[in-house]
Amino acid sequence: MEYEGVLKRLVDYAERAVARGAKAVILVGSLARGDYTAFSDADIIIISDEVPENPIRRISDFMDPSLPVDVEPLVLTTEEFLKMAKEGRRIVREAIFYGKLLFGDPEIIKAASRYLEFEDGSSERWEGE
């Protein structure tokens, strides 16, 4: 399946996740950056405050074997996502600088972007897709 078809299916997946309580679904990794290959999976950050404490249960709640690519979800609460932004964690930096909001509330990403700066001290605000 071509990139546009995969992206459409991922947006549908994200819409279903938001309908089930997720606040935002963000595509990160090679599919978001555009340097994907035929073997790339879909790295997804799902922000939801309605998730189990157990990380494995969180992931299994958002698996979908019907998608044309393997999905690697990272499921975080809003508090966890913002804490990771404050810590400058790579995955959150990637979400802010290269990520594609598939569906959900862009304000969460904007809030996290306030904590991040480039090495030269300047900051970049996420403007959305």
Functional labels for PLM-detected ranges:
Residues 1-24, 32-38, 49-129:
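Catalytic core of pol beta-like nucleotidyltransferases
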Residues 44-48:
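Helix-adjacent hinge/juxtasegments
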Residues 41:
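Conserved binding/catalytic microenvironments
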